């Protein structure tokens, strides 16, 4: 790979050959992927009656450009005279390399000053203000851009248009999810190997973290919903599983401290008590989300019955999504079955802290759409990826299971461990 020149006082050279995966792999997004994504966005903009979109959110930039350098991507609608351009503030050289180098689908050039932005837009064919991501851009930044673009008219919102495009994954993206699931499996093996009586949740989480980091996890789980942030290893031993948290999910765990009040904490494994392990890995940005139960010694009959019931609810939700039911119908089926089993006041939490979903879409973010919840009156699209996670909480702890699935033309494909790993793993007591 080439040496790239950068300006840092005197001219320096940096080695692009270091921008690889853990074993020297080229981890750039294929140029064909970037071309296809920009083409889909151009078609969607035309259908929505928008002339162009100016994208500057890091996640959406990665999806469109293959990197998350500081900058903006302008995409013109099909049939418009707007030419695509990737404007970069920092680092231009790295953005050029990450988007394919000389094979990059569109020009990668220095970002204009804000005082010249309208002139730059007009130079590439824009006659109207480009749409932007009102659902992601901070209010002050939105107002700042709107003020600079007012000579081109009002700025429209294209947030849900972008979200809709990313709901359907390409074949390449699905393979990223599968590899993420394979690494997630290895994380569970690490927890199995180090866990047992007396081990703290954080000790077990550290073992899983080591596997994930070695495989290339970058340290950040991205979420859409403000003010959510996520510790991607939630391990809750015994009664820790019943502790509520800010996180919009069934379980939160104790966390390590009040500022980190989600995930693994200082509680220890006790013989006979349920230990729930819910772990996320990102492979080149793509999420896998999986949950399994552990116990030192034998799990009591009542808890085991609850676990088997959660697996039955999971199967009913997966079957519903696979045959094309609306996500709201999958929710009604799953939550209705839970109510019939006697879990209405314990499903996905305990009052008043119950979450009201049974599955969430995943991709480059943990909390994508659609969701298995009321009012999501649409299907999971073919190519959509979703984590299905029925769980119940009691004062004795949390019980549940979770795998990540993709909808295919033939039904639902499990992208994580699925049947390869049982519902319960027992450590020696």
Could you tell me what each predicted segment is?
Residues 2-429:
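Active-site neighborhoods and metal-handling regions in enzymes and metal-associated proteins
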């Amino acid at each position: 790979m080439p040496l790239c020149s950068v300006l840092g006082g005197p001219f320096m050279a940096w080695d692009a050959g270091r921008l690889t995966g853990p074993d020297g792999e080229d981890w750039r997004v294929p140029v064909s992927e970037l071309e296809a994504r920009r083409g889909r966005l151009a078609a969607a903009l035309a259908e929505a009656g928008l002339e162009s979109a100016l994208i500057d959110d890091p996640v959406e930039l990665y999806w469109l450009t293959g990197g998350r350098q500081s900058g903006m991507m302008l995409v013109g609608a099909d049939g418009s005279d707007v030419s695509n351009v990737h404007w970069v503030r920092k680092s231009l050289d790295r953005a050029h390399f990450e988007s394919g180098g000389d094979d990059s689908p569109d020009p990668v050039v220095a970002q204009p000053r804000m005082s010249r932005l309208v002139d730059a837009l007009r130079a590439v064919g824009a006659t109207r203000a480009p749409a932007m991501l009102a659902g992601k851009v901070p209010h002050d930044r939105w107002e700042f851009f709107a003020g600079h673009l007012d000579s081109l008219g009002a700025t429209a919102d294209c947030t849900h248009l972008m979200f809709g495009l990313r709901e359907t994954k390409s074949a390449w993206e699905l393979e990223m999810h599968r590899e993420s699931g394979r690494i997630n499996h290895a994380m569970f093996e690490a927890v199995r190997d180090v866990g047992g009586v007396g081990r703290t949740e954080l000790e077990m989480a550290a073992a899983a973290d080591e596997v994930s980091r070695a495989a290339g996890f970058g340290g950040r789980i991205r979420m859409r919903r403000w003010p959510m942030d996520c510790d991607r290893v939630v391990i809750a031993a015994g009664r820790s599983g019943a502790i509520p948290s800010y996180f919009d999910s069934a379980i939160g765990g104790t966390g390590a401290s009040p500022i980190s009040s989600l995930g693994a904490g200082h509680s220890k494994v006790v013989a006979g008590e349920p230990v729930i392990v819910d772990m996320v890995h990102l492979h080149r940005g793509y999420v896998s989300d999986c949950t399994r139960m552990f116990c030192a010694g034998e799990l009591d009959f009542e808890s085991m019955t609850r676990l088997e019931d959660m697996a039955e609810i999971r199967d009913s939700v997966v079957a519903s999504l696979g045959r094309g039911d609306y996500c709201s119908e999958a929710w009604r089926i799953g939550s209705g079955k839970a109510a019939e089993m006697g879990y209405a006041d314990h499903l996905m939490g305990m009052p008043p802290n119950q979450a009201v979903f049974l599955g969430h879409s995943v991709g480059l973010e943990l909390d994508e759409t659609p969701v298995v919840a009321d009012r999501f009156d649409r299907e999971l699209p073919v190519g959509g990826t979703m984590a299905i996670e029925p769980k119940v909480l009691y004062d004795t702890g949390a019980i549940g299971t979770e795998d990540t699935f993709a909808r295919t033309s033939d039904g639902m494909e499990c992208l994580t461990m699925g049947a390869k790993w049982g519902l319960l793993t027992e450590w020696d007591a």
